[in-house]
Amino acid sequence: MRLFFTPSMSNLSIFFSILLLSLPLPSIGDLAADKSALLSFRSAVGGRTLLWDVKQTSPCNWTGVLCDGGRVTALRLPGETLSGHIPEGIFGNLTQLRTLSLRLNGLTGSLPLDLGSCSDLRRLYLQGNRFSGEIPEVLFSLSNLVRLNLAENEFSGEISSGFKNLTRLKTLYLENNKLSGSLLDLDLSLDQFNVSNNLLNGSIPKSLQKFDSDSFVGTSLCGKPLVVCSNEGTVPSQPISVGNIPGTVEGSEEKKKRKKLSGGAIAGIVIGCVVGLSLIVMILMVLFRKKGNERTRAIDLATIKHHEVEIPGEKAAVEAPENRSYVNEYSPSAVKAVEVNSSGMKKLVFFGNATKVFDLEDLLRASAEVLGKGTFGTAYKAVLDAVTLVAVKRLKDVTMADREFKEKIEVVGAMDHENLVPLRAYYYSGDEKLLVYDFMPMGSLSALLHGNKGAGRPPLNWEVRSGIALGAARGLDYLHSQDPLSSHGNVKSSNILLTNSHDARVSDFGLAQLVSASSTTPNRATGYRAPEVTDPRRVSQKADVYSFGVVLLELLTGKAPSNSVMNEEGMDLARWVHSVAREEWRNEVFDSELMSIETVVSVEEEMAEMLQLGIDCTEQHPDKRPVMVEVVRRIQELRQSGADRVG
């Protein structure tokens, strides 16, 4: 039997052939193209440190690569020592990218123009490289961009009006480049903006005046929030007068007068210099003689200051080498408390039933080491004898009178809870204020999370982390229960200390009330501070809840809030977690160390519940945050439900 094709059947077959050719290729083909582009990228930028298994068909399990719907949607390679120029033809194939993070590398040259092919790109983080040239116009076609960070590069040229096309943009960081010209009114709904340390001039547009001065420092810009502009738009460097105009008679005569000094003027200058030098020599001789005649038994603080170690962001306590104390070479003690002279000394004041096994003399004689410098002063570990260790905090910026100090510190000393570091004693004089606490052998939670993670430090599993969270929450709940206005005022991981069994003890409670109102000490807990707090001495209970929520997020992510640059491209930790939780990639939030040791599904469910609690605690509006008693209840319930699931 023979088959005959009629003209209509022939047309129909052609139609279906064209239809098949017009259909999109299977996703596996697109993913293969993505993989090829990623390998080309790695080869071009020296990514030998990227341990990608090229034998895998899919790149979705590679470090820094995230897929969705069979395509690569995110590439996050911060701090991977990448270097060199990104060639054209790579991003043109990664067309489904929504997040690209190449920050803190050594990439150079201009941005590839095919970056404009990534029309779905929402977050672009390129800060901390050496990209140069003008910001390419193709970026302004990426209408879905929400976060753009080009800071810490070598971009030049003017800030283009093309930025106005990025109508969804919320973050724009351009600081520390070589951008020049004036600053345009971008007319964007920006939440974060910075153009500091560029070659910009002119006035700051009204729409950008809502940002603080830090966003514009290191430029020649003027206007709110910087200095007021003159009528011409810039402040002249010197007043213009006839005498300053070259070629005028007055100007020439003035120059001649300035060129010549009379003999009397010269003699006066010489005599003045000799007399001044003589006075300086006499003053120095008196000072040295006075210092040599001083006879006190105090410890010279100037010597110990050489041993004090600054802890960046207060992330960790200082660990001294074994059997070594930071002691003053002229005295057996390293804790400088008071000037002890022949007229006698004041005594330590102990609280409640605290065992008085030592006095101020013992404290002065004790060998000690610096633990770290905190918001309210320097902490020392004092070794009184073979079995007695205490922590001594030497307060700074406390200027209140004896009676007021006594009233406030007695409130602190009366606090008694198993999850608080007990205040055992204090010393007060006009020049020195000392607080004596129990010594916590495991140091702080901050040190445990962000300190040395060598072979000697076991990984922190979820049971330990959630237990620390519960203990700290109970301590704060106790503080809040004492009075409706009672708060900690400085909640952060470095103020959560640990016993040998990892039981949490909250420290530094009540000390915010002691700091002088005129203190210029910078607030070192910015990453923990609630947005409504303007005075560190007046912190509400709901602000404590916010700070504790940041600690919860810190436990879950392993990230330090004080290091804002590392917390997802310049956002603080709380906002970063809020944003990624909305995008539903929670598994990328959790600490990789934690994920590597926890394989039980129930644990991940607990972690997700704790993440939600951390998000609730860090709500922008105080009324939306839970109270501490509710926080304690929720942590108890999620820990109990986890125990029930595993039997």
UniProtKB/Swiss-Prot annotation:
Mind listing the GO molecular function terms for this protein?
ATP binding; protein kinase activity
Summarize the PTM comment: Autophosphorylation.
Tell me how this protein sits in the membrane: Single-pass membrane protein
Does this UniProt record's set of keywords contain Transcription regulation? no
The cysteines joined by S-S bonds are: none
Tissue specificity? Expressed in root tips, lateral root primordia, stipules, and floral organ abscission zones.
Q: Which UniProt keywords apply?
A: ATP-binding, Cell membrane, Leucine-rich repeat, Membrane, Nucleotide-binding, Phosphoprotein, Receptor, Repeat, Signal, Transmembrane, Transmembrane helix
Q: Give the signal peptide, or none.
A: 1-29
Its predominant location is membrane
Q: Does the keyword Ribonucleoprotein apply?
A: no
* TM spans (from-to): 268-288
Tell me the compartments it is located in: Cell membrane
Q: Which residues carry this modification: Phosphothreonine?
A: 388, 520, 618
**What upregulates this protein?**
By wounding. Rapid but transient down-regulation by salicylic acid treatment or pathogen infection.
Where on this chain does ATP bind? 371-379, 393
Q: Where is the Protein kinase domain?
A: 365-639
What is the documented disruption phenotype for this protein?
A: No visible phenotype.
One cellular-component annotation, GO: plasmodesma
**PTM-bearing positions, type Phosphoserine:** 367, 444, 540
Renumbered ranges of LRR repeats: 69-93, 94-118, 119-142, 144-165, 166-192
- What subunit structure does UniProt give? Interacts with At3g17950, At3g27210 and At5g05190.
This protein's domain notes: The protein kinase domain is predicted to be catalytically inactive.
To which protein family does this belong?
Belongs to the protein kinase superfamily. Ser/Thr protein kinase family.
Name under which the protein is recorded: Probable inactive receptor kinase RLK902
Organism listed in the record: Arabidopsis thaliana (Mouse-ear cress)
